[in-house]
UniProtKB/Swiss-Prot annotation:
This is Glycerol-1-phosphate dehydrogenase [NAD(P)+]. Pathway: Membrane lipid metabolism; glycerophospholipid metabolism. It catalyses: sn-glycerol 1-phosphate + NAD(+) = dihydroxyacetone phosphate + NADH + H(+); sn-glycerol 1-phosphate + NADP(+) = dihydroxyacetone phosphate + NADPH + H(+). The gene is egsA. Its cofactor is Zn(2+). Keywords: Cytoplasm, Lipid biosynthesis, Lipid metabolism, Metal-binding, NAD, NADP, Oxidoreductase, Phospholipid biosynthesis, Phospholipid metabolism, Zinc.
Amino acid sequence: MHLMEFPREVILGKNLIQEINNVIKRLKLGSPGLVVYGPITKKIAGSNVEKIVKEEFEVYSITVKEAHINEVERVISKIRDKGIKWAIAVGGGSIIDVTKLASFKMGIPFISFPTTASHDGIASANASIKGLNVKTSIKAKPPIAVIADIDVIKTAPKRYLAAGVGDIVSNITAVRDWKLAHKLKGEYFSEYAASLSLMSAKMVIRDAEIIRLGQDEGIRKVVKALISSGVAMSIAGSSRPASGAEHLFSHALDMLLDKPALHGEQTGIGTIIMAYLHGINWKKIRDTLKIVGAPTTAYELGIDPEIIIEALTIAHTIRPERYTILGKEGITREAAEKAAKITGVI
């Protein structure tokens, strides 16, 4: 059996905080609800969301500091104690991922209200949570609705939108890896999911100059592409259409660094290197990232070149069952250094 789950509603536009109660009514979610935000996203939109929802529904709130299993447990306790029927995540990747996993474990729906367009977790079923004995993302359920308010997303530093582009272009190498696993390992491959994923990447490459401006049109394009990536993963029933060796590289960096860069910044650089290994046009990917203002070198990422090389050599161990261009044995230090140098990453 192949189960596909998607958001029931995706709303993209301006001044959407006013629309939240209509979404809750249309989806018949009832009361009480839970607003989940971070210390910063509370100020950006969380308090406003809470105030609007309170006008028509009973609602509680909780502040989440990081994407850690302890925070997930705190949210679960709140859901249990207050008999919460649904949750709304107001924030970036961490807040959305914590809410996603907590609501999944408690069997309640959640609404995704992103404050940044920095990665494809805003509409996907996957959550990246620290403190578990898994090194990568875990599968939960996608949001029942996504409400992407351009006015809110626009207030985030441009760095976040550029990181979103980094996460989307990584679909190019992810699909290559997936095809490779299909050919060499007989892994299930969905032409439809792969096409949707690649289309998202092609669109942001084509519209990089518009995205660079950080205005409404560019934000709209990135958000649409991120949501399409999430839907592609739902169709595939796995993160395969949007996560390959470049994501393993990013997870390796997360393990090696005390303070990693943004997820999309790391996957963007990973994509340049993996595209080189695949023998495809890595310069086009690098140029796109440069146009939107995303980092393309270790120096711009603020990461020691030595760490880049190490991450490349250990990336294959992160998810041994996920076959990629790195192969089962990984790549040698020499090959890693050569790839990083040729692509100008180090």
